Amino acid sequence: MFKRLYENRDIIEIKVWRVEKSSDKPHGFKYSLVFIRDGKRVIGYDNAERKRDHRHYRGKEYQYSFQGIDTLIDDFFNDVRRFKNEG
């Protein structure tokens, strides 16, 4: 688990667990990556129970194609950078 609280009170939290492979987690990982601003999730990547891999961006949910943990983390931080640049 990784959690960082920034001076402006933004929060980034990353959790990854290795789990038994299943129909909703065929890669054998359960994960939750969130970027929180003003107490609200604005970006999130997860595969909650009975939901396949997906991402949340500014209140909308999108399917996510899991390519591995390193790519997952890169994609998450790319979204965080994009969000911060959009203002």
Predicted features and spans:
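Short, compact, well-ordered microdomains
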Residues: E61-G87
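The feature represents the first ordered module of a protein
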Residues: M1-H54
